[in-house]
Amino acid sequence: MTIQMTTVPPKPSSLRPAVAAIAAACALSSGAALAAAIVLDRPLWLASSFVFVPGFVAFVALTVTVRRDEQELFLLRLKAGLVAGALATLAYDGIRWIIERLDLVSVNSFQAIRIFGAGLTGAGATGNAALAAGWAFHAINGFGFGLAYVFVAAGRRWGWAVAYALVLESFMIMLYPGWLGFSMSGEFLTVSITAQNSTESTPIT
């Protein structure tokens, strides 16, 4: 009597570089849409249609077609990225809210939320629809930033998180002041950098 032994292939300890890179690029598509809207001076809804929507569709397609031996790790990275993005966004917004609530600065960094919404809905920035759309886009950005980092750098030294935060901060400093209609100031830098630094301690698996 012959007993056949089935060998279970070992699970990969990391995703293929191409898979990680594509996942990260797709996750950053909402941020890329925002940057395109600002730089090209086009409505956010238009930039999102050509950048974010294809990126989201590609991410979903990657999720369901990733190689079987990578599926478990991919889903773990997906869950970790969503959690990291949520925690980082809460920390970022919480620090900004505290600084501005205590009147430590006169700048209102949250006005960007309504401008996001107005760019997506075409409605006035004071409407409830614009506010809801703006917060939704802000949350999507936060999730996307968390996902991109986890897919590329999960488990790496904390220096990677610092470098990633500095890159995001650099883009914000370059794009936001002119787009929001105020000049670069020490107050804006204080709020932005302090809030961004608070995201570096977010636990990432």
Where are the regions a protein language model picked out?
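Transmembrane alpha-helices
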Residues: P9-Q71
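Aromatic-anchored segments of alpha-helical transmembrane domains
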Residues: A27-A37, T89-G94, A165-P177
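Membrane-interface helix-boundary motifs at transmembrane edges
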Residues: R68-K79, F151-R157
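N-terminal signal-anchor transmembrane alpha helix
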Residues: R77-R101
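Interfacial helix-loop-helix junctions of multi-pass membrane proteins
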Residues: L102, M174-I204
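Membrane-interface interhelical connector segments
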Residues: L102-A129
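Hydrophobic alpha-helical transmembrane segments
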Residues: A133-L147
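Internal alpha-helical transmembrane segments of multi-pass membrane proteins
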Residues: A153-F171
